[in-house]
Amino acid sequence: MSNLEKLIREKCPNGVKFRKLSECCNILDNKRKPVTKSAREKGEYPYYGANGIQDYVSDYIFDGCFVLVGEDGSVITPSGNPVVNWAEGKIWVNNHAHIIEEIDGVLLRYLYYYIQSVNVRELIHGNIPKLNQGDFKNIRVAVPPLEVQQEIVRVLDNFSFLSAELSAELSAELKARQQQYEYYRNKLLNFNESPESLDTLHTHTHTHTHTDTLVDKK
């Protein structure tokens, strides 16, 4: 039995409650400021748009840890999930990305992974794809106890670290790792899974971990 399964059985005997995203974080969209490219002064601070860093500028409007979710433009992946970025430190965010910060009771890193697992295809509207603020705020989030959130984050952070390492090595292995990561992410964040399914996931994880020891990294 995996540590995660033990935690879920201990902390969530009656299942997991769902809350609106707006109840799980602070949404800071009203503090965003767009700056045209011609008006930007070059500098050291990342300037974020819908799908990540667009430029580096001389000033910042946010300082801390944040999750950014594409609002309009390139805001959806081929699998129907939103475009999500993790941002730390001093940054500038334009009005093409929703920005959220942590509140007590819900880990920001957990939301970072959870939002990536949500299918928002039916929420995207317009000729220019847009995830409007109303739909964004109403995304339903499964909110397990903090101990469960922490364990999910630990597992997914490990996969993210491995993927980052492998990106400098074997592209084929990276693709397999990415598929494995997405599989585990979706399984770990699907609280409708039965305990038997979690048993299978634990066995799956152990098998993959054992196989990894056989990879020759010359």
Stretches found by the model and what they are:
Residues 1-218:
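Charged, alpha-helix-forming regions
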